[in-house]
Amino acid sequence: MLRLRCKAKNGTHLMQGLTHQSCVQELKDKIEELTGIPCDVQKIMVGYPPSSLDLRNGEAHLKDYPIKSGDTLIVEEEKNKPKPPVQPTVTKGPSFEVTPVVERRVVPADNSCLFTSVNYVMEGGVYDPACASEMRGLIAQIVASDPTAYSEAVLGKTNEEYCTWIRRDDTWGGAIEVSILSKFYQCEICVVDTQTVRVDRFGEDAGYTKRVLLIYDGIHYDPLQKVLPGSDVPAQTVFSTVDDVILAQALELADEARRKRQFTDVNRFALRCMVCQTGLVGQKEAREHAKETGHTNFGEV
């Protein structure tokens, strides 16, 4: 089954019931049903930047075209003659001059920012605040299924304690959870640190072909995406692992944030235990306090 969306003037629509064996005419009929644009005047584009597909052969199969699960098809109505193959925005000239940029997509700081961010990039830029509970449960299931790999030495608590802990909505995700999600999605997850301006690449040696990026300021995670400024073209959140340009652009964004002091030094920031009101300094003291007392609800002072 192909998981596709189409974007037209009347909004973005989920396209269901199509597979790689579906023919072009089935695709066009589905688009007409969702957008109201007649089959014979549809201009269908895919990719980033988007380029037009030659879909004149209605009996051809979708597997013969560069259409893959997760894609968003851009659909316009052709008025007279065919337009240039790359025309995602209305410009004064015939050439496409807009340069894609990498940006941070801010998500809420609600203890579940890691899970929200990973879901956002893996779903192609779909924000779903309700996903965190499901992802926490998924991680707990994976950990519980392999107590040897996920031992107390790895988790910092027993396997059973960890599974109970990660399901709570007041706990934070970190490197362990990113590693688990990388394996689950079969995707390299790159975390760009704004304090050190480095990239931690989870799944780097696993041979994955896909890459997604998060930015991390010492406490909070946000997803990174590539967008065309001033355009309605959907953001790109999944990249090839051979695309090192995107890593360089992400590091530039992190360096800019560092110069603006947009990070939290987790070794020196002031915290307070919200259970017993004990004052603490830095991540190390917070972890030790949690280990001694079982308290895990901290607030920044």
From Swiss-Prot:
The gene is yod1. Its main location: cytoplasm. Residues 166-176 are annotated as: Variable-loop. It catalyses: Thiol-dependent hydrolysis of ester, thioester, amide, peptide and isopeptide bonds formed by the C-terminal Gly of ubiquitin (a 76-residue protein attached to proteins as an intracellular targeting signal). One of its GO terms (biological process) is protein K29-linked deubiquitination. Gene3D superfamilies: 3.90.70.80, Phosphatidylinositol 3-kinase Catalytic Subunit, Chain A, domain 1 (3.10.20.90). A zinc finger (C2H2-type) spans 271-295. This is Ubiquitin thioesterase OTU1. Residues 107-113 are annotated as: Cys-loop. Hydrolase that can remove conjugated ubiquitin from proteins and participates in endoplasmic reticulum-associated degradation (ERAD) for misfolded lumenal proteins. May act by triming the ubiquitin chain on the associated substrate to facilitate their threading through the VCP/p97 pore. Ubiquitin moieties on substrates may present a steric impediment to the threading process when the substrate is transferred to the VCP pore and threaded through VCP's axial channel. Mediates deubiquitination of 'Lys-27'-, 'Lys-29'- and 'Lys-33'-linked polyubiquitin chains. It comes from Danio rerio (Zebrafish). Residues 5-83 are annotated as: UBX-like. Keywords: Cytoplasm, Hydrolase, Metal-binding, Protease, Thiol protease, Ubl conjugation pathway, Unfolded protein response, Zinc, Zinc-finger. Substrate binds at I219. Its EC number is 3.4.19.12. It is found in: Cytoplasm. Residues 244-249 are annotated as: S2 site. One of its GO terms (cellular component) is cytoplasm. Residues 102-227 form the OTU domain. One of its GO terms (molecular function) is cysteine-type deubiquitinase activity. Residues 216-220 are annotated as: His-loop. It holds the Pfam family zf-C2H2_OTU1_C. PANTHER family: HIV-INDUCED PROTEIN-7-LIKE PROTEASE, UBIQUITIN THIOESTERASE OTU1. The active site is at D110, C113, H220, H295.
